[in-house]
Amino acid sequence: MSYFMESERIKLRPVQKDDLKKLAELMSDREIGVLSGEVYPITEREMDNFYDRCQKTDDRIWFVIIDKETNSIIGETGFLRIFMPWRTADYSLMIWNRNYWAKGYGKETANLMLEYGFNSLNFHRIAIGVVGNNERGLRFWKSIGFKEEGKQKDGFFNNGEYSDFIMMYLLDEKYRVTRNNNKT
């Protein structure tokens, strides 16, 4: 099987129909789902509908994240709401397997995807949204260079509680400066 992108420890390839059951299984962890800003649990049928939408439109690109050593799916990542006239997209990244948390797999994935987004797809702007009480997620995105641009007050509701939704962005020129500084 060919892979779209790879780095030292991970491979990225487009989501395939055969991946949906495993993704639904990984996404069944309610605590992780809340951190991701989605309403969970996700059923296999909902995953199937998402997959079909990905196949029918050109406004989203979705990949599974695979650990090279075990050849197992550990998460998913992709661009959505791609709008090429403005060269913008929203970005999503989720390491669903807790065994891979805080070990650099998220950063490795983000680096591959940002390089792809800015250098291959020629995006000018990539945006993300982070649930406000996900302090670890906010620190992660800031460490990669994303900046806060606004807050949707009580923009996320889960388990009877509202949380703010923090909007963040990264522009191509900031990405290039950050990457060049890291190479020296």
Question: Where do the protein language model's features map onto the residues?
Answer:
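A short helix-loop-beta-strand connector motif used in the catalytic cores of GNAT acetyltransferases and
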Residues: 52-64
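Conserved GNAT-fold acetyl-CoA-binding loop/helix
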Residues: 31-51
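Conserved catalytic core of Hanks-type protein kinase domains
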Residues: 26
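Short helix-loop boundary/capping segments at the starts of domains
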Residues: 29-32, 56
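Acyl-donor (CoA/ACP) binding surface of acyl/acetyltransferases
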Residues: 1-21, 29, 62, 69-184
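Juxtamembrane/interface motifs at transmembrane-helix termini
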Residues: 42-46, 54-56, 94-96
